[in-house]
């Protein structure tokens, strides 16, 4: 055999079987950076139609987690696939750099501004800290194989971006959407600042739930409303609340106008009294109050009780009964304690009735000095004292501990309060912003489509947006207000542009350094500078304008796609929609795609305390970024994305299958020069034509899946092709022809041409997902080519070949099915020790007329398809008793061990082995391939 071994075309490639990704990927990254790969891609798409995916900026604080990786990898897959489709798809990563979390980190290091350090110095420290965080995160993102303008990202703290944020606010003002008001806002007493909706998390909390009686100022008159004359006992209206600390700010009792309310009399502790309760809640309430028997004196609608007055339980004034749509009978008494300074619904209904917006609570959550009974106490600690006072006054009907969902600060994880403070708001309704935003939502494509109804509900129900914060590190609200009237300066828009010009040169510190007289001249004494900063959600929400509209690589095209986690409907998607609609009357995006959160194998959130956190850095250092990228692509991101070590190891197994396929292709293209060896598709062996046609059809399916952002479909189709049509069928069949046919002969070159087309197509299919591996394959493909696959478009060499009808796709699928049945029977014969390998087998196929015609069409080449030394086709009716039934009703099989001699070169057992004297151990086919013109293959 040693003499003939060198006549075989054995596969050879530098592409290693083991990826060794953790070590090789960083080397590739160095080359990408050195070669300026991102700029090469940009240069290759000059003048093409833009596709703009705008990066939602992660916060510049801490290391990236697996959720960040999912987000960036999904974006990278889209950008690369759009580039492959011929678009000019720049990717400019960004970071959110202002705000409280950075302030808190810097405070730990240098103290609060105004203590050991000035506010200006504090801002500079914040800027330095954010820059350090950006650098750390940037390296981690680059390690994932994400291509972008990493050396020139956008930062919300860039002077130019800070200036453009101010300019965007001036447009919002110009459009009439900004107003100042005293309204209850989410307030964190630990932050000492208002919070945005997106900065609020809901966690379970135990609160005191109390039922409180408000005695009527005129009980006889109130009883008369229920048809009871000359009533002589006290009548009380009862509220239920879980925030006793808000009772000092109570200014009304809210009822539902259409709800039925009952006047219920009972005796307790020797005292007869009557309570007003929602009719449907009477039984549950009296059970809470341990009332065993009662009498319903009368019933009336809530509307009949409007403006009836009741005594505040411990303060010296009366409060009216008012009507509100927010009152329900889900819990409590059907009557709502109303404190306009401590609740959004309370505020809205209070405005209708002109109620005082009382706020006895300071920034730190402590009652102000003039608060009767509770001055100087923290509101949450005062709850017990409020309850004790109510008990003392005889107003407490019930008190229990109540577990419920309650808003918490996203940063401190502590309960927050609603608190009325003077703030700046973007109005939802004064100039039709809500209505227009809802129209724009309809014009946007939401992926998955449930995103539309989700954000619609949020926009329908959201309050005005409080955009002001009382912080140090943030973009200032650069306004001058009249000291007496609190009105904006009439030239606010032009003044803001002048301030923006200064910020563009000096950063936000320019505002605090500014002497009002520099801009206002003699008017300076009449106005004061606003010291509030913008909500950081305004910073990121305005980047469609402050960044995309400002950077030249976006060509003024506008944004095609926003892509973030599903929590961003109330976050970045919402803030961007509000600002863009306020500025321009339209949404800032055409498509919005959301992905689910990452959870562990048991569906639990990642948590350090549980110990189920999977850090992307650990994955890339152990398995490589391509494994992480494959997991992201293969997971349906529309729901929760499950990840664990076991799941990642399965991804590694799937990766190996793709890698092994690529290695087979490259190894068998050794010595192939497409410039001179490529066989035209129409001249190929039929099986080669078929596989090229399958690849062409698959490419269309893969491109469509990429276009629809269905990356799990891409990976499914790719794995199916590698495993079934290639691995189990085509590649298995062509090994014999590839290794044993004449090196330069048509049979082998036809096969290599098909492999070349598949490799050229496949390297592009995998490039958006398995970027490192695609680059590795690309460098080893034969033929003249550009330096990188990432500058290419989808492969154009796959012609959709029209096969003869007898060799249609269905025909080859039928042969694949037959081959699978033959393999089963051969495998059983192997287990029974009747044969060794499949080439020791002779197979007899008993087939019906239709199948017989199909099988005999390719003549003697059927044995190559079946990987047997001999294949005979006989009528199904002639099947012997030993014939094995198959899952195909039209086919029975007999497998026998060949009695013919084994060819030393191709290992086929053939009767003609030894018939040629010069090569006594070879079959005639091998002799032809060694010394003659090479065998002729027509079909397989």
UniProtKB/Swiss-Prot annotation:
GO terms for cellular component: cytosol. SUPFAM superfamilies: Anticodon-binding domain of a subclass of class I aminoacyl-tRNA synthetases, Nucleotidylyl transferase, ValRS/IleRS/LeuRS editing domain. It is found in: Cytoplasm. Its cofactor is Zn(2+). It comes from the Bacteria. InterPro entries: aa-tRNA-synth_I_CS, aa-tRNA-synth_Ia, Anticodon_Ile_BEm, Ile-tRNA-ligase, Ile-tRNA-ligase_type1, Ile-tRNA_ligase, M/V/L/I-tRNA-synth_anticd-bd, Rossmann-like_a/b/a_fold. It comes from Shewanella sp. (strain W3-18-1). Binds 1 zinc ion per subunit. PROSITE patterns: AA_TRNA_LIGASE_I. IleRS has two distinct active sites: one for aminoacylation and one for editing. The misactivated valine is translocated from the active site to the editing site, which sterically excludes the correctly activated isoleucine. The single editing site contains two valyl binding pockets, one specific for each substrate (Val-AMP or Val-tRNA(Ile)). The gene is ileS. Keywords: Aminoacyl-tRNA synthetase, ATP-binding, Cytoplasm, Ligase, Metal-binding, Nucleotide-binding, Protein biosynthesis, Zinc. Catalyzes the attachment of isoleucine to tRNA(Ile). As IleRS can inadvertently accommodate and process structurally similar amino acids such as valine, to avoid such errors it has two additional distinct tRNA(Ile)-dependent editing activities. One activity is designated as 'pretransfer' editing and involves the hydrolysis of activated Val-AMP. The other activity is designated 'posttransfer' editing and involves deacylation of mischarged Val-tRNA(Ile). ATP binds at residue 608. A motif ('KMSKS' region) lies at residues 605-609. Its EC number is 6.1.1.5. GO terms for biological process: isoleucyl-tRNA aminoacylation. Its main location: cytoplasm. Zn(2+) binds at residues 903, 906, 923, 926. This is Isoleucine--tRNA ligase.
